[in-house]
């Protein structure tokens, strides 16, 4: 049905399925359904340790800059590769079309979808790890998987292995949104989470499109493989100095 109609279908799903679901099923706080933050029965000490901060105060804390810039470069690398993944698949010669249940599926589209499926799994997987490990560890695993996935899908010309690396790439970037919010939650507490996430966008959003422009320009210059490798190298650099506090006090 073409890319444009596919996006139209996505838009209709958001309007008629996701928005009503959010309206009736998403809660504001765990207490609404008889649960507790971080599964702690005694919330008094937890809540008293979290002071509501002024927006300008976020910029005074080094951990705010570290988390924001680490994920800014992670999104930079992810966006540059993900946007151009179908074109890269075609350049690798993955042009075959399969028929499944009467629907034609191109190899390029399947690989792209497999990366997206990895993204869904990554959200659940890294959310699980974040509850059970020091927050630094899931973030490092996530970014390492994104980097490994990028290097693999760039260098491999076997389609089966290529799709596996696409999935690994998806696992990595899929956990990014979950882990970024979790990192800010660990550092600044639940009372400041909404504000700090919004302020961090001032740093993250301007950086994110750079990867897309860089890789797109590299495609025009027939240097996109080098740009993919650069995206793979940027990802691990972004978490080199990411060290989070072990409690919600900054």
Regions found by a protein language model. Give the residues of each.
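Interfacial helix-cap and linker-helix signal at transmembrane-aqueous boundaries
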Residues: 1, 89-90, 129-130, 215-222
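Helix-loop-helix hairpin linking two adjacent transmembrane segments in secondary transporters
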Residues: 1-29
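Extracytoplasmic gate region of multi-pass secondary transporters
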Residues: 62-119
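Cytoplasmic membrane-interface "Motif A"-like loop-to-helix N-cap segments
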Residues: 132-143
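C-terminal ends and interior cores of transmembrane alpha-helices
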Residues: 146-157
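Intracellular juxtamembrane helix-capping segments at the cytosolic ends
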Residues: 175-188
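A late C-terminal transmembrane helix in Major Facilitator Superfamily
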Residues: 192-219
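Conserved small/polar residues in nucleotide/adenosyl-binding loops
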Residues: 240-246
């Amino acid at each position: 049905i073409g890319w444009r109609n596919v996006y139209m279908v996505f838009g209709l799903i958001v309007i008629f399925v996701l928005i009503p679901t959010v309206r009736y099923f998403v809660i504001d706080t765990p207490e609404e359904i008889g649960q507790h933050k971080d599964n702690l029965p005694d919330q008094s000490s937890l809540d008293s340790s979290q002071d509501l901060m002024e927006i300008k105060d976020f910029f005074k804390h080094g951990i705010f800059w570290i988390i924001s810039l680490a994920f800014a470069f992670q999104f930079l690398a992810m966006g540059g590769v993900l946007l151009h993944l179908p074109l890269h698949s075609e350049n690798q010669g993955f042009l075959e079309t399969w028929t499944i249940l009467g629907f034609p599926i191109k190899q390029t589209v399947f690989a792209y979808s497999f990366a997206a499926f990895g993204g869904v799994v990554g959200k659940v997987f890294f959310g699980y790890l974040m509850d059970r490990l020091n927050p630094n560890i899931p973030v490092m695993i996530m970014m390492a998987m994104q980097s490994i996935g990028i290097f693999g899908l760039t260098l491999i010309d076997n389609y089966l292995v290529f799709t596996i690396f696409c999935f690994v790439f998806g696992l990595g970037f899929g956990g990014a949104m979950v882990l970024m919010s979790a990192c800010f939650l660990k550092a600044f507490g639940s009372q400041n989470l909404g504000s700090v996430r919004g302020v961090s966008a001032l740093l993250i959003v301007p950086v994110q499109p750079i990867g897309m422009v860089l890789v797109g320009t590299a495609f025009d210059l027939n240097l996109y493989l080098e740009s993919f490798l650069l995206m793979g190298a940027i990802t691990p650099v972004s978490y080199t100095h990411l060290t989070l506090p072990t409690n919600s006090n900054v």
